[in-house]
Amino acid sequence: MKSSGSARTARRNAALPSTDAQTGALATVANGRAKPATKPKDSIRQTKRTTKAAGASKPAARTREDKDGPLFEDIRFLGRLLGDVVREQEGDTVFDVVETIRQTAVKFRREDDSQAAQTLEKKLRKLTPEQTVSVVRAFSYFSHLANIAEDRHHNRRRRIHALAGSAPQPGTVAYALEQLKTSGNASKRVLQRFFDDALIVPVLTAHPTEVQRKSILDAQHDIARLLAERDQPLTARERAYNESMLRARVTALWQTRMLRDARLTVGDEIENALSYYRTTFLDELPALYGDIEAALAEHGLPARVPAFFQMGSWIGGDRDGNPNVTAATLDEAINRQAAVILEHYLEQVHKLGAELSVSNLLVGANDAVKALAAASPDQSPHRVDEPYRRALIGIYTRLAASARVRLGEGTVPVRSAGRGAPPVRAVPYADSEAFVADLKVLTASLEEHHGASLAAPRLTPLMRAAEVFGFHLSSIDLRQSSDIHEAVVAELFARAGVHADYASLSEDDKLIALLAALADPRPLRSPYIEYSALAQSELGVFEKAREVRAQFGPRAVRNYIISHTETVSDLVEVLLLQKETGLLEGAFGAAHDSARNGLMVIPLFETIPDLRDAARIMREYFALPGIEALIAHQGAEQEVMLGYSDSNKDGGFLTSNWELYRAELALVDLFRDRKITLRLFHGRGGTVGRGGGPTYQAILSQPPGTVNGQIRLTEQGEVIASKFANPEIGRRNLETVVAATLEASLLPQSNAPAQLPAFEAAMQALSDAAMASYRALVYETPGFTDYFFAATPITEIAELNIGSRPASRKLQDPKNRRIEDLRAIPWGFSWGQCRLLLTGWYGFGSAVSAYLDGAPDAAARTKRVALLKKMNKTWPFFANLLSNMDMVLAKTDLAVASRYAQLVADRKLRKHVFERIVAEWERTAQALAEITGHEGRLATNPLLARSIKNRFPYLDPLNHLQVELIKRHRAGDTNARLRRGIHLTINGIAAGLRNTG
C-alpha cells in the first residue's frame, strides 16, 4: 500500500469549502493586498448583525451557512486586521511572502495539487531566518484569532437560541431538569438529596505542554471583549472606535513576545491559574449557583442549594516528577490564593457599603444587624441611621484583620478609614464560616424588610462566593509518586532501628511493619537525627500542609494523591507519613479516639495492569485494621483517581477507555458492598488520547452507578485557556459539568442499554485486539523508539520553556531512551504536532477487522456489524468513544505526517513504520465508516468539521516550516532565530489544533 495514495485520500476527506471567503484570509482582496484601514465597508455587519429580528426570528428557516455567516465574517475581519498589522510592522515584502504561502497552501489543500505542494516546500526553504519567524508568527496569530472568533460565535448562537425562546440546549441545567421531569426523577426530595450529597470539583493543573504566555492571553481576552461589542448596535463613531481598539490589540499581540525567555517557575504557574479566577471563576461560579437555583425554582424545587460545586488545584502541590515543588511552593500557592480571594471579598464589601445606603428612619433592620452596626468601629455621625453601612464597615475591618494575620501586613490592599483616621485593629474572623454568618445576617434582615432585591446584585453572589471559596480559594491536592514515599518510610524505619531494609520486605511484611508503627503512639522520627535531603523535603511538605490547614481551614488541603499506586502498602505509607508529621489525630486502630482528620489518601491507578488491580487493592485496604474507622471519620467517603494518560500510552486508545470502564464498574460494586460512597477523580487531559473531548458527553458516557453526584476531574494546563479565558465560555463549561452530573446520576439507565452484556463482550474482544495491535507497533517494533524521536518534535518540545516540570521522567540518552520513560503528556503532544494524533485512534481498525474476521460465516459477520452499529446508537460509552475518535481522525493528515517521516534517517525503518501507521489509519477510517454509516469525518457535527477544515491552510505552512527548521536544527545549525522559529511553530500548531497535550 502506497502512502502517497493514502495521503491524497486523507486530503480529499478534509477538503475545504469552495469559497475562499470562508477561510479568513489575511487579506480579503484578490490581488493579496489588504484593504485600507480607513475604508468603512462593514454594512453587512451593521444591517445583519445588529437587528434583533435578524438574529432571533424564524431560526428554523435559516441555513447552516446563514447561521455561520457571522463567524466567517469575524474571521475575515480579524484576518484583515492581522494582514494590515503585518504589512505595517514588517513591510510589503514579508506581507507578500505570507500571502503567497497562504494561497499556495490553500491550493494544495483544496485541489490536491502536487505542484502546489512542491512550490510550497520551495518557498519555505528559501525563507531567511528573519522571514521564517515572521511567517510563523503570522500563521500562529491567525490561529489564535480564529479561536477567538469561534468562541464568540458559540456565545452568539446560544444567545440567539435564548432570544428566540428555543427549548433548553443539551448541556444546560434547564435541559437536565426537563429530562429528569420527563423521566419522573425531578421530585423535590430527589433533587434536595442530590444537592445535599453532591460534590463536583474541577481541578486546575499545570503541565509540561502549556504553551500560552499570560501576556498573550490577556491581549486575547481584550480582543474577545471588543469582538463581542460588534454584535451590539453601534453608531458609526462607536464602530470606528471599536475597530481602532481592535487594531491596537492585534498590534500589541504582534509586538509581544510569543515565547517565554525562561522556563516557567511554579510561581508563574500559580499566577497563571489565578488569572482565570479573576476573569471567570470569582464572578461566574456564584452566578452559576444563581442560575441553578432559578431553574430549580421554576420547577417548584429547592430554592437554595449547598456549596456542592467547588474548585481544586494541583499547582503548588503536585510533586510527582517535579523537584521544583516543595513546602515553600505549597506555602506560596496557598498565600497567593488567599490574597486573591480576600482582596475580592474586601472589594465587594466596600462596594456593598456604597450601595446599601438603607436608612432606619425609612425602613427597619433586625436586631442582629443592629448588633453588627453597634460593634462596628464606624463612628461617623453621617451614618448613624444607616445600620447596613455601619455593619459592613465592621465586616470590612474584620476581613482586613483576617488578611493581615494570615498573610502579613500589606499583602492585600486595604482602604483606609479616611484621612487622619487611626488604623483600626479589629478582631479577625476565625474562619470563613464566621464571615458567611455575618453576610447571612445582612441578607436575612433585608429579606425581612422588603429589601430582597437589594441583596440580589452583590450580597447574594458574595455570600455564595464565601461559601464556595472560603479563605483558601481552591483546595490544593498534594501528589507524589509511591516510590518516593517508600524511600522516605524506609529511611525512617532504618534510622529508628526498626527495619534495616524496609524496601526489600514482602508486601505482607511491609503492611505488618506499617500497621505496627501506626498503632504505636511514639514517632519513628527523632529531632536528634539528621535525615536525607529527600526525607526532609518530603516530610516538610506534610508539615506545611498541617500548618496550612490550621491557618486556612481543612478544605485548603484535604487530599493526598499517590501516583503509581500498585500495592496496598502504597496507601498505608502515606498514612504513616501523616502520623509522623502530626496530620493524623488520635491513635490508629484504637477502639476509642481512633485516627481522624488527616488528608484523604487517594490512589491513582494509571497503567492497564494497575486499573485491572484497582478493586482488589481497595478491597484489601478496606480490610486492614483501623481503616474502617478512618473512613467513617471521612464521612464514609473514599476517592479513587483514574489516569487516562499512562493507560493510553500503555495500551492504546481503545483499551485505555475500556479498562477504565471496567475498573469503574468493579469499584462501584466493591464500594456498594462496603456501604462507602465512591468519588471518582478523572485525570483527563486535553487530547482525546488523554481522556479529552467534550466534557458533557464524557460524563454521560460513564458506566452506570459511577457518578452519583460525586465527581472530580482535572482541567489540564494546556486547555484551561480555551475553556475559561472567556467568562461566557467559562460559565457554559462550568454549567455543562453540573448538567451532565445531574443526568448521569439521576438518569443512570441511559447508559445501561438492554443488550449491555453482549455489548461488553464485544468491547472486550475489540480491546484485546486493539491493545495487541498498539503494543506491536509501539513496544514490539524494533527501532520504533528511534522513529518516534526522529519523526516528531519531542526533543524540541523538551527544550521549550513551557512548564515547570520536565517533559521526561529520565534524561533522554539516545542509547538508553525508552517510550516507557517518557511522560504521557509530551508523548501525546508530539503526535499532535506531526498531525498523526496516533494516541486517539491507533488499533481500532485492526480490532474491528479481527472481530469481524473472527465470525464463523458471512451471516455471523453481518450480525457482528449490526451489533457494533447498535452499540453506537444505544450505548453512550461506545458512541462517545467513536465520536472522539472521529474528531481526532478529522485532525490527522497523512500528507503532512509523511513530511515528518522524512526526518527519519533510516529509510527502511521510516518506510516500515510509516506504512504500518498509514495502513492502520485506513483500516480505522473504514471501520468507523462501516459502523456509523458516514464516509466523511464529523458528518454529524458540520460546524466543527468546517472549523477544522478551515484551519488546515493555516496549519499546513506551520507544519511544513517546522519540518524544515527541525531538519536544519538537527543538522547542526545553531542560529538562535531558527530555534525560536521551531518553538513558535509548536505554539502555533497547538493553537490551531486547540485540544492539545
Swiss-Prot record:
Going by the record, the broad EC class of this enzyme is: lyase
Query: Does the entry feature the keyword Acetylation, yes or no?
Result: no
Q: Give the positions the UniProt entry annotates as the active site.
A: 207, 649
- What's an example GO cellular component term for this entry? cytosol
Keyword Magnesium assigned: yes
Q: What cofactors does this protein use? A: Mg(2+)
From the UniProt record, list the reaction(s) this protein catalyses.
oxaloacetate + phosphate = phosphoenolpyruvate + hydrogencarbonate
Q: Which UniProt keywords apply?
A: Carbon dioxide fixation, Lyase, Magnesium
**Which organism's genome codes for this protein?**
Burkholderia vietnamiensis (strain G4 / LMG 22486)
What's the protein called, per UniProt?
Answer: Phosphoenolpyruvate carboxylase
Name the Gene Ontology biological process terms. Answer: carbon fixation; oxaloacetate metabolic process; tricarboxylic acid cycle
Q: Which GO terms describe its molecular function?
A: magnesium ion binding; phosphoenolpyruvate carboxylase activity
Which Pfam families is this protein grouped with? PEPcase
The EC number(s) given in the record are 4.1.1.31
Q: Which InterPro entries match?
A: PEP_COase (IPR021135), PEP_COase_bac/pln-type (IPR022805), PEP_COase_Lys_AS (IPR018129), PEPCASE_His_AS (IPR033129), Pyrv/PenolPyrv_kinase-like_dom (IPR015813)
| Chain segments carrying region Disordered | 1-67
What protein family is recorded?
Belongs to the PEPCase type 1 family.
**Function per UniProt:** Forms oxaloacetate, a four-carbon dicarboxylic acid source for the tricarboxylic acid cycle.
